[in-house]
Swiss-Prot record:
Similarity comment: Belongs to the mitochondrial carrier (TC 2.A.29) family.
Keyword terms: Membrane, Mitochondrion, Mitochondrion inner membrane, Repeat, Transmembrane, Transmembrane helix, Transport
Primary localization class, coarse: mitochondrion
Membrane spanning stretches: 13-33, 77-97, 129-149, 183-203, 230-250, 266-286
GO CC terms, sorted: mitochondrial inner membrane; mitochondrion
Pfam families: Mito_carr
Function: Transport of FAD from the cytosol to the mitochondrial matrix.
Superkingdom, natural source: Eukaryota
Gene transcribed to yield this protein: FLX1
Endoplasmic reticulum in keyword set: no
Repeat region (Solcar), residues: 7-101, 123-210, 224-310
Protein name listed in UniProt: Mitochondrial FAD carrier protein FLX1
């Protein structure tokens, strides 16, 4: 029996899709916590809203609705799982193709390719940054409708008035109340937020190639250990998330139910948040996001690197 040989693009898509799915299953409750903290930034009544207040609210909603706390914590799992699997699969596929295209457009004639590693060993941070940005822009545009529905589902308890009961119900209600353009709410800050992924990949792949280069020079297996993956992932994510977090917060608020009720627009929304909490309001929920983002990205990239290595 002949082993199936996956193409580089297939490896990227399969590894990315699998990594996104596994990560979502593990950290979904933290994602829900992050969304609700971000949405509290536009509420004067919730100016001092923190993680424990969100948890108390979830427990209270659970008691009122008769649903278990676990069900409340995993509200919106289906669409989050679907969205992250699609987004990571598309992103990794596009990123792998795009960085090769950019490299080949600037490479000198006669540049060599090492067996099994593509041209990554010849690339620099600018190529990773450019590939990450262009791939992120395309992925953000393709998946924005999913994130609008996800944000609205996760921002409310199932028993709340007007809450979406499912993905299908969410699409129906959104099209009825907001029209087709409602599917693209929050796209502008989402496109600016693409810089987070681009910065992350610039840091991650640059550090990764340095480690692999040393392994290659010492005749070792050209593959990151899980500990090495966690090390460079944590550093890259901490830097990138902190720098562009306000765009994530703005996107979540523009995609929420409250955005439709109060007719939020980007610049008035920024003014409202600053009026409620000052400039620090643009970073509301950052600590919870880092607690979620760093472990989740470590899981994503450990699954991605290991699966890609074995395909």
């Amino acid at each position: 029996m002949v082993d199936h040989q996956w193409t580089p693009l297939q490896k990227e898509v399969i590894s990315g899709l699998s990594a996104g799915s596994v990560t979502t299953l593990v950290v979904h409750p933290l994602d829900l916590l992050k969304v609700r903290l971000q949405l509290s930034a536009t509420s004067a009544q919730k100016a001092h809203y923190g993680p424990f207040m969100v948890i108390k609210e979830i427990i209270r909603s659970s008691a009122n609705s008769g649903r278990s706390v676990t069900n409340e914590l995993y509200r919106g799992l289906s669409i989050n799982l679907f969205g992250n699997a699609i987004a990571w699969g598309v992103y990794f596929g596009l990123y792998g193709v795009t960085k090769e295209l950019i490299y080949k457009s600037v490479a000198k004639p006669g540049e060599t390719q090492l067996k099994g590693v593509g041209n990554d060993h010849k690339m620099n941070s600018l190529i990773y940054l450019s590939a990450g940005a262009s791939s992120g822009l395309m992925t953000a545009i393709l998946t924005n409708p999913i994130w609008v529905i996800k944000t609205r589902i996760m921002s409310t308890s199932k028993g709340a008035q007007g809450a979406y009961t499912s993905m299908y119900n969410g699409v129906q209600q959104l099209l009825r109340t907001d029209g087709f353009q409602g599917l693209w709410k929050g796209l502008v800050p989402a496109l600016f937020g693409v810089s987070q992924g681009a910065l992350y990949f610039a840091v991650y792949d640059t550090l990764k190639q340095r480690k692999l280069r040393r392994k290659r020079e010492n005749g070792l297996d050209i593959h990151l250990t899980n500990l090495e993956t966690i090390e460079i992932t944590s550093l890259g994510k901490m830097v990138s998330v902190t720098l562009v977090y306000p765009f994530q917060l703005l996107k979540s608020n523009l995609q929420s139910f409250r955005a439709n009720e109060q007719k939020f627009r980007l610049f008035p929304l920024i003014k409202l948040i600053i009026a409620n909490d000052g400039f620090v309001g643009l970073y509301k929920g950052l600590s919870a996001n880092l607690v979620r983002a760093i472990p989740s990205t470590c899981i994503t990239f450990c699954v991605y690197e290991n699966l890609k290595h074995r395909l």
